Amino acid sequence: MDITQLILDEHAQQRALFAQIDSIDAKDTEALSALWTRLKNLLDAHAEAEERFFYPRLMKIGTGGNDADSAAEETEDAIEDHNDIRETGEAVDKHPVGSDSWFEAVGECNKANSDHLAEEERQGLTDFRKHATLEERHEL
C-alpha cells in the first residue's frame, strides 16, 4: 500500500476516534476509557512509524512542500508536533475519565493532533508524493 495513503487513512481514523469520544456521555467512563486507550495507542504507534520510516526518507528526497522551506524543516516540525501530541496525550491520563478536566485535556490533544495533521498533509505528504516513485511509496 502507498505509504502516503496509509498515513491519510490513519489520520481519518484519528479524527473519527476523537469525534466518537465527543459523542459519548461523560458517565460512560468504560466506553470513554476504551476509546481513549485505542486512540492513544494509535497516536503513539503512528508517530513512531512516521519517525522511523517516513521522515528519514523524506529528509533524503524532499525539498519542502507548499509552505515549508525544506524537508528538514518539515521533519523537525513534525517531530516537535509528535512530542506535543505525546505530552498532551499523557496529560489526559492525569484526569478522572469523563470529568470536565479529562474532556478539556482530550480537547488539547485533539487540537495538537489536528494542527499537526493539517500541516503534514499540506507539507510532508505533498513533498513526498512529488519526489518518491510510486514503487517506493508502496515499498515503505
State what each model feature region is.
Residues 1-140:
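Small-residue-biased structural context
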